[in-house]
Amino acid sequence: MAPGVTGSITHAAGFAAAAVARVPDYLGLGIDIEQVMERDVRQSIEHSIITPSEAACLDLQDGDFSRESLLTLIISAKESFFKATFPAVGRYFGFEAIEFSGINVQEQTLSFDVIETLSPALHLGHRVVLRFGYLDPTTVMTSFTWRRNPLDNR
């Protein structure tokens, strides 16, 4: 990455995307594209990739999305979060560092709670909000913009 900028790239299912921003305003950007997983895949991996709290939160969702779509969105969002924060955190961390806490369908946002302190700005209990959208009926895209001003992190 060139000095003074941050960015992210992604590709899947015939789609590709890139995002860049100036470092003074943005600490990191993360984007991810994923194909919505099939039901048999979801059934075989769900309990190994989400926490019991996340599973309970998924159970409370009102049915706007299939469980496969929701799980794909969660995985994609965690990937976007990792891409945006890894350069500042400076170490590898697992997807369990943040925990899904809700979805706002109208605003197309996903909320996550930080459950492992990653940096002074990303401490235990901090809430992050990521955006999502559909590129087609079976392909999702998520993004996380980590801004210097924490009130702008949407």
List PLM regions with ranges.
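Conserved nucleotide-ligand handling architecture
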Residues: 1-154
